[in-house]
Amino acid sequence: YYIGTNDRKTELFEGMWPLPKGVAYNSFLVKGEKNVLFDLVRVNTIDSYVQKINEIIGEGEKIDYIMINHMEPDHTSSIKSILEIYPDAKLVTNKKAVAMLNNFYEITDNIIEVKDGETLELGDKKYTFYMTPMVHWPESMVAYEETTKTLFSQDIFGGFGTLDGGIFDDQIEYDAHYHEETTRYFINIVGKYAAQALKALNKLADLDIQLICPDHGPIWREDPKKIIDIYTSLAKQETVDGCVVIYGSMYGNTEMMAEAVARGLSEGGLKNIKIRDITKTSNSYLLSDIWRYKGVIIGSCSYDNNLFPPMDYLMTEVSHQRMKNNYWGIFGSYSWSGGALKTLKKYMEEGKYDVLDTQLEIQGAATEEEMKKLIEFGKEMAAKILNK
């Protein structure tokens, strides 16, 4: 049974990532000889959660086991409240999560510790557990139920967005309403650990999976291979032939330069082009663009002899994500002393990025001749992307 809840009130996931479409906290109840809960919900949605449990097993009935696949508070902050209702429930989790249960909630009793590859028979169901460390916390694990061929995948295969009516992939328009939010979720939450995610996906590759139950986003029963392929592509950071131009401009001069660069990209034969104003766009979306586009051009004004602060913050985030499959281009502008281009060069060197040799720095507003150079700069990136 699906007993998850929707959260349309929280505006920022983890205090950072915008939730314009909200988020679902998925939880599952396996009813049988033993009643088993899989992961919980954030405490701010607990009232509707408990109501759903009661509707299925009846008020006064017991929960025998609570599976803790992932300790992040959006899945465990309700655990003390749930244990007050079901005090005899045993918690099933791994060694690292046992320590976290104590650290977060001072829970130390009634815990069954499982290991990688261990199978636990609970009533008429068998669950095999697989550790998936750093996807995206160190204690993360998944559980596979053999008789129904169901994978309880915690945050793996998850995405942003509430489940509005339909919960299964065959009940929704996934490509129209969820694909972008799944992509952004992966890049924002899991992206830094893409190598570990790919390792986890390979570890699970031999399982016969007919149903995927993630902790966020749609449940996959019709075409589970689709979300597996999407996550595999994201974990490999497979880019598309396109370019995102991200600029930081205080008074419009750097913006005009970015427009010239984009014109050059187009004249160079590139069709998939996106321009982003860093002052109006959350890093959540910018990181998602950078992850997916083969070409990335960063243009920034200088500020206090350094990089424009919003751009500096973005580049710090980029350096954390360990992106590897992009071509980069950089340009800077300044009024009386530089700083933007110098700092961008430093980020490029530290990240060992594949950056174009042409790196432009312009004082004040670009002249007609400098605009031509910016257009040529865009053409150079287009040729690199299209392998001309």
Would you name each region that the model predicts?
Residues 1-56, 142-145, 149-153, 254:
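Conserved beta-strand hairpin/beta-sheet module of binuclear metal-dependent hydrolase folds
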Residues 30, 70-72, 143, 155, ...:
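Divalent metal-coordination and catalytic microenvironments
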Residues 33, 44-92:
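Active-site metal-binding motif and surrounding structural segment of the metallo-beta-lactamase
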Residues 38-40, 62-71, 91-95, 151-154, ...:
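Active-site neighborhood of phospho(di)ester-bond hydrolases with catalytic His/Asp-centered motifs
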Residues 92-140, 196-199:
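Metallo-beta-lactamase
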Residues 136-140, 156-191, 235-239:
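Active-site-proximal loop/helix segment associated with metal-binding centers of metalloenzymes
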Residues 163, 174-212, 217-218, 260-276, ...:
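FMN-binding flavodoxin-like domain, especially the glycine-rich phosphate-binding loop
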Residues 214-240:
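Terminal amphipathic helices with adjacent charged low-complexity linkers/tails
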